[in-house]
Amino acid sequence: SGVMPEDRVVEIGPGLGALTRPLLAQVNEVWAIELDCDLLPQLMERTRGVGVLHVEQVDALRVDFGEVARRLGGELRIVANLPYNISSPLLLHLLKYRASIAEMTLMFQSEVAERIAASPGSKAYGTLSVLCGLWLEARIVMTVPPTAFRPPPKVNSAVLRLVRRPAPLAPVNDPDHFVQVVHGAFGQRRKVLSNALKVMHPAPREWLQHAGIDPERRGETLTIGEFAHLANCFQP
């Protein structure tokens, strides 16, 4: 993942240390977050003598990564092989702490990685594409076949490198509101925006027209810049 010895590396879900060992060979210390206490003795055994490993037994979805960055004295680099069932919620959780995270190297099921890196108008484009794309630069760096794992899963995996942009792709007045607008637009995928955004605004058609966006368009056709502009034009 291109880390330097002095980097503050946090590994989420190290399991039995398949990634942890090579990481410890590259950096001075690794901070690992592992919920499954049954794995900890084997993890410690397999990484003994390689480097300094700190392990916290906690649910990553409950971790305040801003606090972790303050404690470790600088921006974090996150490394993780994410279980499919928590990959989207965890990514959205990490996104909240973007000011404290310089970059992330994450392994997802291929389908999720493609959604994150998707362009407007493509089938995979959705909430994750827009929210990540505003603040992060996403690039699929590697695809991993099922045969790389024991037991092999039924799907391909992909490694995604997410680097924080120097500035958001488009100016956003209220980040929380932007997130709500994006969720609203994609909440009912096949609906046109004037219908999909009814939950957010008493007069969605007027709001869209005020933003210069055709109310008959669907969420998957809007660029990240258009989403930002739409959110900025919101007046309840």
Predicted regions and their residues:
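An accessory alpha-helical subdomain
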Residues: 158, 162-164, 170-204, 214, ...
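Short, amphipathic C-terminal "tail helix"
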Residues: 213-236
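Catalytic cores of RNA-modifying enzymes
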Residues: 1-181, 220, 229-232
